[in-house]
Amino acid sequence: MSTLTLAKAKEILKMHTTEDHLFTHAAAVSAAMGAMASIFGGDKDHWEAIGYLHDVDYEAFPHEHCHHVREFLEPEGVDEEDIKTIISHGWGLCSNEVEPTTDIEKSLFTVDELTGVVMAYALMRPEGISGMELKGLKKKFKDKKFAAGCNRDVIKQGFAMLGMEAGEVMQACIDGMTAHKDELGLK
């Protein structure tokens, strides 16, 4: 088995996903994971691949999310460590199989929800994500009615798991997503 690449992750996701919004979310999480890899000294392409593929079973099994990851990824030659990393993002939400313990797992757990807040804020701003300031994102994050579907408790739990300040992780998401704004359909 070889290291999962972003190109391979994109191939695999196309086999199991048809909904545009899931591809956009995959790209957002991938972009944020690339930024987190830079913080932790990880392999950027690999971290982006994990982020891109994290919801591989969601469209087929929305009510059993994370429970079918292995059956989708083992036949594609994805190694066990990567499968466990992907499953870990559902810890306490839809699966208790793998608790996030590594930097990559904790990052995925955190940015999965956080990218939703960043995306919602970017979509409401006339200038999109370009020039987005941390101060504005923090203000929106505190407003529980804004992007209400994004679980703030999970995001805060992720900050604590990572041992990082909220602003540091938020800035990584902004930076990662800004670098991929065209792919995300943002200005």
Q: Residues of each region from the PLM?
A:
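Metal-centered catalytic cores of metalloenzymes
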Residues: 1-20, 31, 98-99, 107, ...
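Acidic/His-rich, divalent-metal-binding segments that scaffold phosphate/diphosphate chemistry
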Residues: 1-61
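Conserved active-site and cofactor/substrate-binding residues in soluble primary-metabolism enzymes
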Residues: 4, 24-28, 64, 102, ...
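Solvent-exposed alpha-helices and their adjacent loops that cap or buttress functional pockets
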Residues: 5, 99-100, 153, 162
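Predominant activation on well-ordered alpha-helical scaffold segments within soluble catalytic domains
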Residues: 10, 14, 27-30, 34, ...
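Structural signal for hydrophobic packing residues in well-ordered secondary-structure cores
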Residues: 16-17, 33, 37-40, 76, ...
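Divalent metal-dependent catalytic cores for phosphoryl transfer on phosphate-bearing substrates
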Residues: 40-146, 156
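C-terminal binding/interaction regions
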Residues: 134-135, 141-179, 183-187
